[in-house]
Swiss-Prot record:
Lineage of the organism: Eukaryota, Metazoa, Chordata, Craniata, Vertebrata
InterPro entries listed in its UniProt record: INTS14, IntS14_b-barrel, IntS14_C, VWF_A, vWFA_dom_sf
Protein name in the entry: Integrator complex subunit 14
Major localization class: nucleus
Gene label: INTS14
Tissue: Strongly expressed in numerous cancer cells compared with their non-cancerous counterparts (lung, prostate, colon, stomach and skin).
């Protein structure tokens, strides 16, 4: 899950810390040292994690947007300036903004807040924010709880005694409580020094950033894998005394099933399953990450020559169009499947079902599923034209179709450019031209985007005027016809703007002689 590191750069972080036998450090130096340790760990063990860096005092600033380049994050730590008083609320508002803008409100996120425990003074201080949170309007609400699933980890550049001498610890605990109890406060054990800061950040790493390694099993075949992101414990709400369920480190495949039978089931979370490569010695299992490029290349070459069950499983599921049912724990299952990342790349994914004996009602109880060979006759029929499970409806649902997505401007621009490219290749691309044109027309009508139809019509008329003299005469006729039909649809009248109506090619005939045409 993404991580936002929030660094306090107020004046209180410049307070000196005396360390015997060495130069004088400031608290911000200790914080930067701890974050460097965290970034180095993530660069080695959490390379797929997206991390952003935010700094704050009375205002907040996004220093590094979400990235996987941990060198950039470490460079930003050394370029931070000192500012004015502390205002934690503004930092939390900034976190809300950047996470929602990048990930929306459904993706879980971890927030690491690094501060010295000073709450600020006067208006804008944490004391003032907490005292007035119940007196605010909905438009000016306190940013906690975050409007997305989250965990808030507060790293204090102070020891427990220092925080308890004021009400700082109590106010910071209120932040965790306001975030629905999701998170934890870390303090320095003993005097403020580099060693104790490393120990504190080590506890955070053990809690939140330890990679999840497991053994994938299928009969006698096994493979060491990393599951990313780390699966979170799941608490069953219906239980009288709920106990968090944690998935086993032994993931055993209990069977295989057609994709059509399992369809698109509800899941708790989705995870990448990555085979763990051998290290450069080739005799121990590691993450495959080495000190330099030459060693890394040699390690990859060694790993590429060794057969791996994870690779075999991924390829088999992709070719056969099946998914593997995997046992996660007692009465808890998931599925392994191949998911296309692009036209040429796919990943082995694992989705977790809800715990229980019957997570997918149409399959029945998982414990009662068995191989086809146990049945008296093939439940799929001799020609593979039946299914032992409730059949899916013949009409595809909207989520199963290739719908037009214009969330970003680039999506709309791509669709318009596709129409123009086909327009320049008329009449050879007549069928493709009208197919793309009707797809855009339907989407525009569905969204009420009538101005788009007029705009595309103007573009087609312009393309018609730019046709070269050598162009086929049919091209001009088709472009003019398409532009006229789009302009009629842009009026919104029911006669020309029917959603189910398609623009058909203009019937022309240039096969006869010129005298016959006259």
């Amino acid at each position: 899950m993404p991580t936002v590191v929030v660094m306090d750069v107020s004046l209180s972080m410049t307070r000196p810390v005396s360390i015997e036998g060495s130069e004088e450090y400031q608290r911000k130096h200790l914080a930067a040292h701890g974050l460097t340790m965290l970034f180095e760990h993530m660069a080695t063990n959490y390379k797929l994690e997206f991390t952003a860096l935010v700094v704050f005092s009375s205002l907040w600033e996004l220093m590094v947007p979400f990235t996987r380049d941990y060198n950039t994050l470490q460079e930003a730590l050394s370029n931070m300036d000192d500012y004015d008083k502390t205002c934690l609320e503004s930092a939390l508002v900034g976190v809300c903004n950047i996470v929602q803008q990048e990930w929306g409100g459904a993706i879980p996120c971890q927030v690491v807040l690094v501060t010295d425990g000073c709450l600020g003074i006067g208006r804008g201080s944490l004391r003032h924010s907490l005292a007035t949170q119940n007196q605010r309007s909905e438009s000016n609400r306190f940013p906690l709880p975050f409007p997305f699933p989250s965990k808030l980890y507060i790293m204090c550049m102070a020891n427990l005694e220092e925080l308890q001498s004021t009400d700082s610890l109590e106010c910071l605990e209120r932040l965790i409580d306001l975030n629905n109890g999701e998170g934890q406060i870390f303090t320095i054990d003993g005097p403020l020094c580099l060693k104790n800061v490393q120990s504190m950040f080590g506890k955070l790493i053990d809690l939140a950033y330890t990679p999840f390694h497991a053994v994938l099993k299928c009969g006698h075949l096994t493979a060491d894998v990393q599951v990313f992101p780390r699966p979170e414990p799941f608490v069953v709400d219906e239980e009288i005394d709920p106990i968090p369920k944690v998935i086993n480190t032994d993931l055993e495949i209990v069977g295989f099933i057609d994709i059509a039978d399992i369809s698109s089931p509800p899941v708790l979370s989705r995870h990448l399953v990555l085979p763990i490569a051998l290290n450069k010695e080739g005799d121990e299992v590691g993450t495959g990450i080495t000190d330099d490029n030459e060693d890394e290349n040699s390690a990859n070459q060694i790993a590429g020559k060794i057969p791996n069950f994870c690779v075999l499983l991924h390829g088999s599921l992709k070719v056969e169009g099946m998914v593997a049912i995997v046992q996660l724990g007692p009465e808890w299952h998931g599925m392994l499947y191949s998911q296309a990342d692009s036209k040429k790349k796919s990943n082995l994914m694992m989705s977790l079902f809800e715990p229980g004996p019957e997570p997918l009602p149409w399959l029945g109880k998982m414990a009662q599923l068995g191989p086809i060979s146990d049945a008296k006759e093939n439940p799929y029929g001799e020609d593979d034209n039946k299914s032992p499970f409730p059949l899916q409806p013949k009409n595809k649902r909207s989520y199963a179709q290739n719908v037009t997505v214009w969330i970003k401007p680039s999506g709309l621009q791509t669709d318009v450019q596709k129409i123009l490219r086909n327009a320049r290749k008329l009449p050879e691309k007549t069928q493709t031209f009208y197919k793309e044109l009707n797809r855009l027309r339907k989407a525009a009508l569905a969204f009420g985007f009538l101005d788009l139809l007029k705009g595309v019509a103007d573009m087609l008329e312009r393309e018609c005027t730019l046709l070269p003299e050598t162009a086929h005469p049919d091209a001009a006729f088709q472009l003019t016809h398409a532009a006229q039909q789009l302009k009629l649809a842009s009026t919104g009248t029911s006669e020309y703007a029917a959603y189910d109506q398609n623009i058909t090619p203009l019937h022309t005939d240039f096969s006869g002689s010129s005298t016959e045409r006259i």
